[in-house]
């Protein structure tokens, strides 16, 4: 154990700050890359029902893909509130739909197993638009209850700027798992250092007591 627990004291002095630094760095990564939002309406039901807390990863406009569920905010819709919708069309895509029929993108029907009650149409009228470059055509998964791009067709074909996107739902939580485990490891290292420091202190106190006698 070393004279009067000096080895443990040194371990404590090294491990506590090192562990806390590791945990703080990992938590900073999580805070920088990820956010969350609570679903307020039923537009994304059944995929994300009202009240569900959704984990989101922050992305740049260039990283957005077809099918992504994104959180975006635009000043001229929804009173400036952030909303969650699915990316159907991107710049240059031709998006079409007839009542009761499937959504087609560039002439190909979309397979949409996520839509509410298997209904890809809802109450919307027929539309046929070409998405402007740098913009997105977005729909809710509950087509009969979503106030989405279909209802703003006179505003640049119902699209919103890709730069309005704040975050998207990640494909998996693996990306979050690494920094989360790193943070946990850092806390365990700090706890180990604290334990070593405590044992060292007790050892020194015990040694002094024996010498006093």
Q: Residue ranges of each PLM-predicted region?
A:
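Extended hydrophobic leader/signal-anchor segments used for secretion and membrane insertion
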Residues: 1-213
């Amino acid at each position: 154990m070393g004279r009067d627990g000096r080895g443990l004291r040194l371990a404590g002095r090294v491990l506590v700050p090192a562990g806390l630094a590791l945990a703080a760095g990992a938590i900073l990564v999580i805070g920088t890359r990820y956010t969350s939002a609570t679903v307020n309406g039923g537009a994304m039901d059944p995929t994300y029902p009202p009240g569900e807390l959704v984990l989101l990863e922050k992305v740049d406009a260039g990283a957005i893909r077809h099918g992504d569920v994104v959180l975006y905010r635009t000043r001229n819709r929804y009173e400036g509130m952030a909303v969650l919708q699915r990316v159907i069309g991107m710049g240059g895509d031709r998006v079409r739909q007839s009542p009761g029929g499937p959504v087609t993108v560039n002439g190909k029907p979309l397979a949409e197993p996520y839509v509410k009650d298997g209904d890809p149409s809802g109450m919307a009228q027929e539309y046929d638009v070409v998405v402007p470059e740098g913009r997105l055509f977005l729909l809710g998964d509950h087509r009969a209850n979503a106030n989405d791009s279909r209802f703003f067709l006179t505003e640049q074909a119902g699209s919103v700027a890709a730069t309005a996107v704040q975050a998207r739902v990640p494909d998996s939580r693996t990306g979050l798992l690494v920094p989360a485990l790193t943070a946990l490891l850092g806390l365990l290292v700090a706890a180990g250092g604290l334990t070593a420091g405590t044992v060292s202190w007790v050892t020194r106190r015990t040694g002094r007591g024996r010498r006093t006698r």
